[in-house]
Amino acid sequence: MAIFIRKMHPLLKIMNHALVDLPAPSNISLWWNFGSLLGLCLIIQILTGLFLAMHYTADVSMAFSSVVHICRDVNYGWLIRNIHANGASLFFICVYLHIARGLYYGSYLYKETWNIGVILLFLLMATAFVGYVLPWGQMSFWGATVITNLLSAFPYIGNMLVQWIWGGFSVDNATLTRFFAFHFLLPFLILALTVIHLLFLHETGSNNPLGINSDADKISFHPYFSYKDLLGFFVMIFFLTTLALFMPNLLGDAENFIPANPLVTPPHIKPEWYFLFAYAILRSIPNKLGGVLALLFSIFILMLVPLLHTSKQRSNIFRPLTQIFFWLLVANSIILTWIGGQPVEQPFITVGQIASISYFSLFLIIMPFASWCENKILSLN
């Protein structure tokens, strides 16, 4: 009877097609676990965020104190806050690995799924940015001031745009209140887009490591991949709890333990680690507007990847030349992340500029050209 309910009930039928009887390629590897891990991350962040919002006060005179109150006086408030703060880092680790897998195995050729994924990344970054402002520490305040000020680079409307976002002539109470509203709202928008992301994915079915049609060799999602995902859940929760309980401030900034002071600028303003690669690209261009456009393009360049696919093969698994350049891109992104956390002085400026040029060159010129060369080598036989 249970089988019939699962397959006949209008609501359960949708769940069944998405989670139980979903046909999945039999050879998908560990790299296909990150989609479900991102779903788990999103649920953890929404739940912990909801409990934090119950005790947080979005007011410049009380925001910092309310976070201290959560950590000291609320039952397990310190744990909820540590899980929420470190959960964001884990979220971005999973996102970057998910994107890397998509780039390596050619999953970007499912254009609708991929483009919605890029929009999801942009929304996730926006959510993390406005969330980082909420504790109202020094780095929160100055990070908000510096990043929002970048919008003034746009001609004609720039200054008006900045003041409109600030709700005044500086980052103040109006800014904090609206950032809290955005931080509360955006995760639910991410949740809605995630459903659309999955709808498009289930239209085409999952890609696989070989990058070939796997219709002849599909197995049901449950129990095979549901248990495989469950292992990933346990591993991720282990890492998250280890980070939250033993090293909760490892990925944070010490400056944020100081209440926001508009009269004292921190010696080195930098965002959270997961934005450092884009921040390094922003800083590597001397022109303000050019830097802002490069910052945006560093993320939206992912939308061009399907258009720049010149190879006759989908996956990188049998393409040694493209593999080399893919791993160079990974190394380059790590170098950019390191540079973004360093002060603006030599040799970091030059290294950042070289890494930024390499980042865009690999996407726009080198990898498409490598694919074209591989096609030529294949046609020799």
From Swiss-Prot:
The cytochrome bc1 complex contains 3 respiratory subunits (MT-CYB, CYC1 and UQCRFS1), 2 core proteins (UQCRC1 and UQCRC2) and probably 6 low-molecular weight proteins. One of its GO terms (biological process) is mitochondrial electron transport, ubiquinol to cytochrome c. It comes from the Eukaryota. Disulfide bonds: none annotated. Heme b b562 binds at residues 84, 183. It is found in: Mitochondrion inner membrane. The lineage of its organism: Eukaryota, Metazoa, Chordata, Craniata, Vertebrata. The chain crosses the membrane at residues 34-54, 78-99, 114-134, 179-199, 227-247, 289-309, 321-341, 348-368. It is a multi-pass membrane protein. This is Cytochrome b. GO terms for molecular function: metal ion binding; ubiquinol-cytochrome-c reductase activity. The keyword Transmembrane applies. Binds 2 heme b groups non-covalently. Keywords: Electron transport, Heme, Iron, Membrane, Metal-binding, Mitochondrion, Mitochondrion inner membrane, Respiratory chain, Transmembrane, Transmembrane helix, Transport, Ubiquinone. Coiled coil: none annotated. InterPro entries: Cyt_b/b6_C, Cyt_b/b6_C_sf, Cyt_b/b6_N, Cytb/b6-like_sf, Cytochrome_b, Cytochrome_b_C_euk/bac, Cytochrome_b_N_euk/bac, Di-haem_cyt_TM. Heme b b566 binds at residues 98, 197. Belongs to the cytochrome b family. It comes from Sphyrna lewini (Scalloped hammerhead shark). A ubiquinone binds at residue 202. Component of the ubiquinol-cytochrome c reductase complex (complex III or cytochrome b-c1 complex) that is part of the mitochondrial respiratory chain. The b-c1 complex mediates electron transfer from ubiquinol to cytochrome c. Contributes to the generation of a proton gradient across the mitochondrial membrane that is then used for ATP synthesis. Pfam families: Cytochrom_B_C, Cytochrome_B. GO terms for cellular component: mitochondrial inner membrane; respiratory chain complex III.
